[in-house]
Regions:
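N-terminal pre-Walker A segment at the start of P-loop NTPase domains
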Residues: 1-28
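A short, well-structured beta->alpha microelement
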Residues: 18-27, 77-100, 105
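A general structural signal for stabilizing positions within well-ordered secondary structure
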Residues: 28-29, 159
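Residues immediately N-terminal to the Walker A/P-loop in ABC ATPase nucleotide-binding domains
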Residues: 32
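Conserved P-loop NTPase motor cores
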Residues: 35-56, 85, 93-188
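AAA+/P-loop NTPase substrate/partner-engagement loops
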Residues: 61-79, 90
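Short beta-strand/turn micro-motifs composed of small residues
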Residues: 66-67, 109, 149, 203
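Phosphate-binding and hydrolysis-coupling loops of NTP-dependent motor/remodeling domains
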Residues: 182-219
Length: 219
């Protein structure tokens, strides 16, 4: 155990800096110069709440929202998003330069597995993968990314995100066990019993650690 807290909400900016989420100045990520999160779980598990908590640490950075969901999520009521129109015309023209022209930013791809238009879905997946691959210090600015999904095993849309995002956020006690084991096997944790936790954040590259409901723990 590295750190014990009463709840995830009590983890401070200083804690995040000490264990690698952000640097000591509070804005720039330590590892790889940017942050990338894959957040997966069923409806109502806490994906939006977790996303909002992460974004709230970076109040001065631009935030783009990519989603096909029309209803406004209450968890995002305090987040000022620039919502991107989910059309072929917009997504075909959108570049990484467009996203970073005003400075460092966040791109949130919310429930990407719900998009039914095959053309839009393909364009969005291409953009999402491009950001993960090339969004680090693009043109002098950085694109941080959060990808949320209902499924841990929708590899057609999220394979690249799963394999390349530095952080996974999972909700073990609300996730199908077989999906959870398949995901954890990728980092050698398939035998770990995480079922008692509501939410686990795993930093899946060096240094390997996870933030559970009550602890930050070295793996």
């Amino acid at each position: 155990m590295i750190l014990a807290v009463n709840s995830f909400d009590e983890i401070t900016r200083e804690d995040l800096a000490e264990y690698g989420l952000i640097n000591s100045r509070g804005l720039l990520p330590v590892y790889g110069e940017r942050l990338s999160f894959f957040i997966a779980g069923p409806p109502g598990c806490g994906k939006s709440v977790t996303t909002a908590q992460i974004l709230s640490l970076f109040p001065d950075q631009i935030k783009y929202l990519f989603t096909d969901i029309k209803e406004k999520d209450r968890a995002f009521q305090d987040i000022e998003f620039r919502r991107v129109r989910m059309t072929k015309e917009v997504l075909e023209k959108l570049t990484l330069d467009d996203l970073t022209k005003e400075g460092d930013c966040w791109c949130v791809f919310d429930d990407v597995d719900k998009i039914r238009n095959p053309t839009v879905s393909k364009l969005l997946t291409t953009l999402m993968d491009n950001i993960i691959a090339n969004g680090r210090s693009h043109g002098g600015n950085t694109i941080n990314i959060i990808v949320t999904s209902h499924s841990l095993s929708d590899y057609k849309r999220t394979k690249y995100s799963i394999e390349n995002c530095d952080y996974w956020v999972i909700f073990p006690n609300k996730t199908i066990k077989s999906q959870l084991i398949t995901l954890l096997k990728k980092i050698g944790l398939e035998k770990a019993d995480l079922s008692r936790y509501n939410r686990v954040i795993i930093h899946r590259s060096t240094p390997l650690f996870m933030i559970t409901d009550l602890f930050i723990t070295e793996i």
